[in-house]
Amino acid sequence: MDSISLENFRELQSAGVQVIDSRPTVLFSERHIRGTIGISINGSFEYMANAIFKKAEKLILISLNERLSESFLRLEAEGFTDVVYFDISLWFEAGLDSSLVSRVSASSASKYLEKIVDVSNSEDWEVLHVKGVSNVPLVDIVKNPNKIRQDSVLYCGNGHKSMAAVSYLLTKNIITTDITGGLSAMLVDSPDLEI
């Protein structure tokens, strides 16, 4: 599939067309285009797409080449049919500004306990979560971003929904931090946390 041009991408983004970046969370966190939303193909891709984006609206997709067809097909299966592809290397090669996501390691999570919010589905939260931490699922964040305070530290099971939440909140000027690897990593690297 051919990429739209850099000029076309900038025009569409300026016009309010939302951008899905389906690259792995580590790549998105280290370097992405401001205003794009990271929903990794490696996570609950369909759930996150449906939670954040409207099927009737045009979308721009950023993806690794080897996962491009899969990303398109999975979006199409969910009813997202007006999707165009943008090759992010065009942005980077042009030397344009890129953004990063603030992250903290799972081993340091206990330092942020008063700021931590679990953005997992409520069903997953009921099964397993950090003791004393509140739950605001991704779908609820999209409905009302102000449920999350500035400087909150977000996590989910494996770090995919929390990256989606952090990047979505950035588009609403709410700055938060992601815990790398989510609860799975905290169970291993932060044994002092009560689960």
Where are these regions (language model features)?
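Short, compositionally biased "basic patch" segments
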Residues: 13-28
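Short secondary-structure boundary micro-motifs
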Residues: 2, 20-23, 118
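A general structural motif
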Residues: 2, 17, 40-42
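C-terminal accessory/connector segments of nucleic-acid motor ATPases
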Residues: 1-14
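Rhodanese-like catalytic fold shared by cysteine-dependent sulfurtransferases
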Residues: 25-153, 157-195
